[in-house]
A protein has these predicted regions:
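Signature of N-terminal electron-transfer/Fe-S-associated modules in redox systems
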Residues: 1-154
Length: 154
């Protein structure tokens, strides 16, 4: 199936954002992260109008929903690109944007350092010798599942 990928791009946080569209022939079981990698792997990346384009800047670490690096807005919703598959999206036009609550580094990459700085400020961790009840352990386990991707802040 042929998809149109509409990407909100930006050179850096001071630059003005712009939209660029690409086309890709892909199967539904391809993830957004894998699709971006396929676009960037092209010998010569051209947009939908045939104009040569810079590679799309995005972060993809684990590709299996473990690190949160690939968080972005996909069709307006905060999602992980590695676990969002073409077949799960409606339509043949896919809109990709950086998360809106963080400064843009470039294209789909954002600076989430404010999250980590705030966690340091509030000392949100347990000392190694802290006693935990079973209830506390369960809460700690649930919070440890957070990827710190920033999707929940959208």
């Amino acid at each position: 199936m042929r998809y149109t990928i509409r990407i909100k791009r930006q050179e850096n946080k001071e630059a003005k954002p712009f939209w660029q569209e690409f086309e890709i022939e892909a199967e539904g079981e391809l993830s957004i992260a894998a699709m971006l990698n396929e676009l960037n792997a092209r010998q010569k990346l051209t947009d939908k109008s045939g104009k040569e384009a810079e590679p799309i800047s995005c972060e993809c670490g684990c590709m299996v929903k473990k690190c949160g690096a690939c968080a972005m807005r996909i069709n307006g919703l905060p999602e992980l690109a590695c676990s969002t598959f073409l077949q799960s999206l409606k339509g043949k036009v896919i809109v990709l944007e950086p998360l809106s609550k963080f400064p843009v580094v470039k294209d789909l990459i954002v600076d989430r350092s404010v999250v980590f700085e705030n966690l340091k400020k509030i000392n949100l961790w347990l000392e190694s010798d802290a006693y935990m009840t079973e209830y506390t352990h369960e809460i700690r386990y649930q919070s440890a599942r957070c990827l710190m991707c920033g999707c929940c802040l959208e």
